[in-house]
Amino acid sequence: MLDQTDRKLLDLLQGNARLSNAELAEAVGLTISSVHERVKKLERRGIITGYVATVDAEKLGKPLTAFMRLTVETTAESGIDEVHARMSGACASDPDILECHNVAGEDCYIIKVRAEGPKQLERLLSKIRGMAGSSRSVTNIVLSTYKESSRIEPAPAPEADE
């Protein structure tokens, strides 16, 4: 369970992971060593899983964002576990695949990709379709992005019984 101080630390670090323990301590009203211990505990518990830099994809030459929805039919030779293994391997090995989700509903997978342009996107989509043994795919190209964030607000703390 997270207390208010842990929640505040997570909020601060998600906003700027480069904050020093001294800056965090000042913001939450604790000592530097207490903050250090709390952050280490959040890491050990797997709540904080890493620290990353947010980059501008356009400035890195990858201005095109697309979402691909795949439907995969399984056969006796190619069961769902095999398809998941192929998809997991393909997604993990390609740096242009930013996210890959196995989903419930009409589609089997939703994949977020970044590409230099239409030709690179076409090659990437062909590769993904081939790896999945896709029976159907729909690709949506992003025209404008109004919000893109990896920030996660913790669920509210359960209320104590009165």
Residue ranges and their predicted role:
Residues 1-162:
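A compositional/biophysical signature of low hydrophobicity enriched in polar/charged and small residues
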